[in-house]
Amino acid sequence: MSMVYINIFMAFTVSLMGLLVYRSHLMSSLLCLEGMMLSLFIMMTMAILNNHFTLASMAPIILLVFAACEAALGLSLLVMVSNTYGTDYVQNLNLLQC
């Protein structure tokens, strides 16, 4: 495994750990999710280019489409929560609270 793959895997791991540790604000969770999607995109693209998988060449584009949809939904949820509650805490998203 080359150093580039190790660095991208470490970026994914750091983003995952950031998602697990900084769960209080919705914006930090969204940024960590975007970091994970970006590292997955780069790793998938490099694997396809290095192994000459011509049939799977559309997979990174599809991943980018899903990442854009996830970002749009996340930002709309952030705007809705900020307008409703005044903060972007994740604990405000609990539907069981009165």
From Swiss-Prot:
- Please state where this protein is localized: Mitochondrion inner membrane
Q: Which InterPro entries does this one have?
A: NADH_UbQ_OxRdtase_chain4L/K (IPR001133), NUOK/Mnh_C1-like (IPR039428)
* Record-level GO cellular component terms: mitochondrial inner membrane; respiratory chain complex I
Q: Which Pfam families match?
A: Oxidored_q2
The main enzyme category here is translocase
Gene3D superfamilies xref list: 1.10.287.3510
Membrane topology type, per the record?
Multi-pass membrane protein
Q: Which domain of life is it from?
A: Eukaryota
What terms describe the molecular function in GO for this protein?
A: NADH dehydrogenase (ubiquinone) activity
Q: GO biological process annotations for this chain's record?
A: ATP synthesis coupled electron transport
Q: Provide the E.C. number(s) assigned to this enzyme.
A: 7.1.1.2
Q: Which UniProt keywords apply?
A: Electron transport, Membrane, Mitochondrion, Mitochondrion inner membrane, NAD, Respiratory chain, Translocase, Transmembrane, Transmembrane helix, Transport, Ubiquinone
Q: PANTHER family, alphabetically?
A: NADH-UBIQUINONE OXIDOREDUCTASE CHAIN 4L, NADH-UBIQUINONE OXIDOREDUCTASE SUBUNIT ND4L
Family (UniProt)? Belongs to the complex I subunit 4L family.
Name the record gives this protein: NADH-ubiquinone oxidoreductase chain 4L
- Give the source species: Lynx canadensis
Gene symbol here is MT-ND4L
